[in-house]
Structure formats: structure tokens, C-alpha cells
Amino acid sequence: MTGDYKEYKGYALITGGAGFIGSNFLDYAVDKYPDFHFTCIDKLSYVSNYTTVFLSKVLNQPNFRFLEMDLATNYKFLYQFMVEDSEINKITHIINFAAESSVDRSFIDPLYFTKNNILSTQNLLECVRILLGKKEELRNRLNFVHVSTDEVYGEQDENASVDEKSKLNPTSPYAASKAAVDLIIQSYRYSYKISVTVIRANNVYGPRQYEEKLIPMTLGKLKKFINQKSQKIMQDKITLHGDGLHKRKYLHIYDFINAIDLVWMKQGSEVYHSTLESKMSGQIFNIGSDDEIDNLSLVKFICDYFLYRKLSLKNLDYSKYITFVQDRNYNDSRYSLNYEKIKSLGWRPQIPLETGLRKLIDEYY
């Protein structure tokens, strides 16, 4: 795997870039940074419809290319790309989005989540470790941003929040796999002096999110309902776990992308202008929001706005649209991040939840 592109200021490897967050980031970054070259590696799973459809905006850009690869199982090809062909591919930045993220699926097949989420990132770290062993001059000039999750902290009591120094207390197989990866990253930083920054965000929502997540699931079922021949009965109701009162904080995808951009550019600027280890190396940043809402209230808001916009319906009988199902094996009561640290770099969320939801419905549904 070689490249024939011109010389660029930097060469970014974006893993998991064909999915929800990764593809939105690439739309933003490929356009904003024409002096950077972006290589996207993705295995093309169900969340991207097994295609590069979410990459249609960037596929033909001169500073972009796509490689289909499963990081967890194709170590040989990853090694060839990153190590053997390093003189050509010249990776200077890595942003790792690659992971399976469905909590519900992780309860069904926890072993798969362990294998996939841990090996995909550790294979990436191994290639970086070997590359830096061969090219010591890259040690303080290659920066790595890993996208983790707030779920590694477990649940928080009412009115409590966790900061970046809080202990990890995952409660689902998915969260445990992500926490394990965070610790493996920490070990590689200490043992092999790899410059890595970790990002942990609240629930991210926006266009292209797969319908297994609450917001797109709700919107998908409402869209199906209005396309029925008759709107008397909703044939496929919106499902809520337990009593629907579990709380989450929501962050719009565009706000999250701005936070990622801030972190990777700050880390990159530091390593480019110093032979010393970046101050960002080893740092963890919570990317949070103050928009907290329980699942039932969230779904009711979406139903109200969507059905009024599409069918002019008011004063809904929510029982016609919502059904309650057995709760998860374990369902965290709430997540809440203290994000003062990223605020100190100048970032704050700009899109309120209600505004973001209305815009999502108006433009995509």
C-alpha cells in the first residue's frame, strides 16, 4: 500500500472514519486543512451500511484516500502501511475512532467487543511502537488522539460529575473494552514514550448515526410511521428500556468535532515545534454538555416536534408511539462529565439540544 500524493504539511491517519463520528470529522477536516493529507481506514461495518456512502463528499478530494481494512484482524496489512511503507505514507497524526459502540450488542456478544475494540487499537499502537523504534526522530513528532467514551467512568449519582482523574468503573462489556483500551494506551505511553491524548465525550448525536442509538431509532420509527398507509396505529413503536427515566447528556456532532479539532491541532503544533514531549501527551479531556435529559422526556420532545412538523399533530397520546421493554442487564442511571479542562483551552458546546434536534429533523428527516 503506497501513496503517490504530493508533499503535505502533515499526514493524518483516521481510523474508523467511515462511520458516524469519523465521517463527519473527515467532511470537516479534509475541507479545512487542504495542506494535510488524510488516509481513512475502516472495515465498513453495518453502521456505515457496509459502504463508503458517508465518505462521498471527500472520496474524490486530492488530499484524501480510503483503505478498507479491519484493524483487529489485518495486522499484517496495517504493519505494511505504517511501518514498511512509512517513507511513503509518512504518518504524522493518528485519530482513532475505530470501535464497536453498541451497548446492547455488547451484552449479547461481549467476547466480540473485547476482541475487536482492544485488538484494533493495540494493533495500531504496536505499529506505532515499532515505527518509533526504527525512526527515533519521529518519537516527539507523531501525535495520537484516541476517542474513548464517558461510559468508562460508569454511572454518577444525582448532581455528581466526574473529571478526568476519576476512577474507571465500567458496567457494560462495551464500556469495559473501552476502559481496557484506555489503560493499554496509558501503558504504551509510559513504556514506549508514545505521545497519546485521550478524549471522552458525552452522548454524541447528529446526522449519519445508526438507528440502534436512541435518537436515530426514534426518528427512524417516526419516519416509518408517517409513511404508513394509515396513521391510526403505529405498527413499530419506539422502545424504551425499563421506565425510561435513565438520564444522559447530549453533545451535537459538530460541537464534538470542534473539540477534536482543537485537541489534535494543539497537540500537533506542540510536537512540531519542540523536540520535547508534548504537554498534551498523556492528557485526558472530557468533552461534555450541560443538556441533561431522561430518555422518556427526550423521546416525547422528538415526537412532539416531528409529528407536529409532519402531520400537524398536537397533544399526543404518547402510549400510541412509545412502548417500554425489559431493561438492559445493567443500565447506568446517568452520566455527567466535568469538562472544565477542555474549557480552559477555549472550547464550549455551542448547539443546545433542542436546537440541534430541530435542525436534525428539519434537514435529514
Swiss-Prot record:
One of its GO terms (biological process) is nucleotide-sugar metabolic process. The lineage of its organism: Eukaryota, Fungi, Dikarya, Ascomycota, Taphrinomycotina. The keyword Nucleus applies. Gene3D superfamilies: NAD(P)-binding Rossmann-like Domain, UDP-galactose 4-epimerase, domain 1. One of its GO terms (molecular function) is dTDP-glucose 4,6-dehydratase activity. One of its GO terms (cellular component) is cytosol. Pfam families: GDP_Man_Dehyd. This is Uncharacterized protein PB2B2.11. Its main location: cytoplasm. It is found in: Cytoplasm; Nucleus. Belongs to the NAD(P)-dependent epimerase/dehydratase family. Keywords: Cytoplasm, Nucleus. The keyword tRNA-binding does not apply. InterPro entries: NAD(P)-bd_dom, NAD(P)-bd_dom_sf, Sc_DH/Rdtase_CS.
